A protein has these predicted regions:
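A conserved, positively charged/aromatic
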Residues: 2-14, 145
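A nucleotide-sugar donor-handling region in carbohydrate enzymes
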Residues: 12-88, 247
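A donor-sugar binding/catalytic signature common to diverse glycosyltransferases
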Residues: 16, 137-183
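Short acidic-hydrophobic, aromatic-tinged amphipathic segments that line or gate anion-handling sites
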Residues: 18, 38-40, 133-134, 186-191
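Donor-nucleotide binding loops and adjacent catalytic segments primarily
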Residues: 53-147
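C-terminal amphipathic helix plus adjacent low-complexity
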Residues: 204-247
């Protein structure tokens, strides 16, 4: 349903603020006129570059967590099209994580179909190395990401936000399939051994050294600035108001 909604909104829009070059290409390929499409970057990165996130010591005090270091940040959402496999997939992830001594910070999933099974599985697996949050304030979430060793799961934040912190991410399954990703993202299947191998790769010194000069393909933290300028410079003319598909 998300994809269908995005296509519908695109047809109604007169100006498009795309998050990356691939999104620009897809919009134009779908029939949108080139002069309407701007690559401005992902707006959620503005917070990161403007340092609008909490320091780890503040987060520890707020949530009464002691010595929070050497941890994975994990967000695994159900996939509607894979409803029958959601429980098996989350159990594979839980099983894979048991092979690592790092602490696990879980953010419980959205409310899409299959969410209850995912939530129950995560809660049932809880041990002394795990912290589980139903949701977090944005500043806390970004602070936890900045200080994590890996971001694991199938959230878009593993593709979009984590590269700005130069934090590797393990992207599991099909939820983010075909989305633009940087070299910091390791894609893998739902298989337990594949997840284990991907986590080991993300923890390796050789892999992490490659990220020192990483530039986030989703932007540089100046999205709002670009959008404001474009809106100010755009004149409301017949050319803007009257749309036609260019294919």
């Amino acid at each position: 349903i998300d994809g269908l909604t995005r296509h519908a909104i695109a047809r109604f829009s007169h100006i498009h603020f795309a998050a990356n070059k691939d999104a620009v290409r897809r919009l134009i390929k779908s029939g949108e006129q080139k002069f309407r499409v701007f690559n401005v970057g992902a707006p959620q990165l503005d917070e990161i570059y403007n340092k609008k996130f909490r320091e780890i010591k503040q987060i520890q005090r707020k949530y009464n967590i002691n010595k929070l270091k050497d941890y994975f940040l994990i967000i695994f959402h159900p996939v509607t099209e894979e409803f029958k496999q959601n429980k098996k997939n989350i159990l594979n992830l839980i099983g894979a994580l048991k092979n690592f001594n790092e602490k696990k910070i879980w953010i419980l999933p959205n409310n899409d179909a299959g969410a209850l099974e995912v939530k129950n599985s995560v809660i049932s697996s809880r041990d002394t190395s795990s912290y589980i949050f139903d949701n977090l304030e944005r500043e806390d979430y970004l602070g936890l990401m900045k200080n994590s060793k890996l971001v694991i799961g199938n959230s878009s934040s593993g593709l979009i936000e984590s590269p700005s912190f130069k934090i590797p991410s393990v992207n599991i399954g099909n939820r983010q399939k075909n989305r633009l990703s940087s070299i910091s993202t390791i894609n893998c299947s739902y298989k337990k051994n594949d997840i284990i191998n991907s986590i080991q790769r993300g923890l390796s010194k050789n892999f992490r050294n490659k990220l020192t000069t990483l530039k986030n393909p989703y932007g540089d933290g100046k999205t709002a600035e670009r959008i404001i300028k474009i809106l100010k410079d755009t004149k409301i003319t017949e050319k803007i108001l009257n749309k036609y598909l260019s294919y």
